């Protein structure tokens, strides 16, 4: 019937409720808030079109390709329970639309343009189902949970970390000293803060050298393998790799990257280097709240977490759950499972919109960090189980007697909780009792319990402005 110019009606092409999704499709769940007066179907098919092959008008070059093969399809729309004028739109994208092994391209396609679309008041990507065919084009985490435990020779308990504070202003020598004290006291890891890169008061190379010295000294004295997350994030990919190379030359076990500010391309580059050279990779999620904090716009963190597992990282910060609201606990555990497990069943109550099969891609250790201290240890052990890194910054360095006793207190609290759990005690109910008993034979822990006995961080969650 020939080519007819004119503005397109997306509905005819992109709203296909009868479509049977394929195993190779990437499936997306969007939370759509249409502008007043825009029907939900229209918003749904507009999302499908705008994030795949659509353009606003008919173009004659459409005749040179098969839209049916390449278009995204809005295959289901349902109202969000309890919300006015919000809808879940499910969109299926054919795999051909995505470059192999590129998280960058996946996001450019799915969320690149559509979020500014005028017919929508707000748009949030709640979840993605990544098909196994696409997952197998990614290397994923450099090592994963099991290999990390084997490298560190640490089993049957969560790992302990600590972010060195004050994060800016220390000289490299004093920074290294703080690292040594924490590791000597009983922590497994210490950490560069996310914004510790390279400054006039502490250049990266000096920091790397003094931290390596601290690691080796602490290892020699404790007989345990220790690590410090050396932050390799920098202004260019070349400089980042240069820093990772130097870390490898020092023989340290782990480096670190800020994957959102650094970008997925840089992150995947570093992850490949880390696997090739036997370095573990710790990932910080600085900037995530810019993307994931609003309930009705942006992207949920579970999507960023899935993307990180594909791009590559052995640890990633994932919130603490402690002292937060109960509902949030289930949602957090949902994406913690998406990071660690091989196969995760669809479960809307935990925020998991699609069943996800990772086909044996290595898992990522979730890192609980931010405002936690010894009294939280039973809850953290109970909630996260063994496969997690528990990170106490102020909860170590804020100890009245100093860093090493702070580290001792945390290690004693952790070992007490793990032992109590293994003996069949219920940490949810008896947690405080377990900590109190341990205080009797650890003056360091007793002092820590005294300092933090009353501190709580409880606010209602802020997710809409």
UniProtKB/Swiss-Prot annotation:
Binding sites annotated in the UniProt record for substrate: 113, 163, 167, 285, 317, 369
Family that this chain belongs to: Belongs to the RuBisCO large chain family. Type I subfamily.
PROSITE patterns, A to Z: RUBISCO_LARGE (PS00157)
CDD domains, A to Z: RuBisCO_large_I
Its job: RuBisCO catalyzes two reactions: the carboxylation of D-ribulose 1,5-bisphosphate, the primary event in carbon dioxide fixation, as well as the oxidative fragmentation of the pentose substrate in the photorespiration process. Both reactions occur simultaneously and in competition at the same active site.
Modification sites for N6,N6,N6-trimethyllysine: 4
Chain's gene name: rbcL
GO annotations of cellular component type: chloroplast
Assigned EC number: 4.1.1.39
Site location (Transition state stabilizer): 324
One Pfam family, short name: RuBisCO_large
Full protein name: Ribulose bisphosphate carboxylase large chain
Chain positions found as N6-carboxylysine: 191
A GO term for molecular function: monooxygenase activity
GO biological process, one term: reductive pentose-phosphate cycle
Catalyses which reaction(s): 2 (2R)-3-phosphoglycerate + 2 H(+) = D-ribulose 1,5-bisphosphate + CO2 + H2O; D-ribulose 1,5-bisphosphate + O2 = 2-phosphoglycolate + (2R)-3-phosphoglycerate + 2 H(+)
Domain of life: Eukaryota
PANTHER family with a match to the protein in the record: RIBULOSE BISPHOSPHATE CARBOXYLASE (PTHR42704), RIBULOSE BISPHOSPHATE CARBOXYLASE LARGE CHAIN (PTHR42704:SF15)
Species this protein is from: Ephedra tweediana (Vining horsetail)
Cofactor comment: Binds 1 Mg(2+) ion per subunit.
